[in-house]
Amino acid sequence: MKPDQQVLGSIPRFNPIHKILGMMLALPLILVSQGVPAAAGDLDPDRVKRGKYVVNSAGCHDCHTPWIMKDDGPGPDMSRMLSGHPESLVMPPPPKVEAPWVWIGAGSNTAFAGPWGISFTKNLTPDPTGLGSWTEEDFINAIRLGKSKGNGRPIMPPMPWRVYRNLSDDDLKAVFAYLRSIPPIKNTPPSYQAPAAP
């Protein structure tokens, strides 16, 4: 018997199978400690239900779900629920905004122009083009601090993060759980465009 295979009771030490099993058992703990998002099936149904209530009450669909004209007037296109500004909808330059007007919005209700530049609503679905790589902590920090994940750029108007940052931790966790539970939609909205130099 080789020195690295000494017997401890009846279990050989450093057996390759045991190494593999040990790594497989440790992987979930490592991923949780690294902040990897939970799978939708791991979500608490009561928390998801609460999150849906907050999302619907806070008006998230008003901007993050593209609007279309319906028989009874404009409304959210729920087939693209919370997927942000459609990547296929290329916006022309916005018309000039003159005082006392401050900002304008696109008919889709997903693109807005004002003194801050042009902002496009984010995909909030769990797709990789949306919040797929976000952790609960990333989401809460974005809402509390008004900073986009990754580049730390300020979240632009009209996103009312200054209002939403007053939600409780439990409510923000519930919103994130709900967003993790909805169908992923592949859609990469355009990036924010800073205002043109005068």
Segments predicted by a language model, with ranges:
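C-terminal capping alpha-helices of c-type cytochrome domains
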Residues: 133-148, 161-190
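Gly/Gly-Pro-rich "capping" loops immediately C-terminal to redox-active cysteine motifs
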Residues: 69-141, 155-168, 197-198
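Electrostatic cytochrome c docking/interface patches
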Residues: 36-56, 68-70, 133
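Surface-exposed patches in mature extracellular/periplasmic domains of secreted proteins
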Residues: 62-67, 152-156, 186-193
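Bacterial N-terminal signal peptides
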Residues: 21-32
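The canonical Cys-X-X-Cys-His
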Residues: 51, 57-67, 139, 175, ...
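N-terminal secretory signal peptides that target proteins for export/translocation
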Residues: 1-18
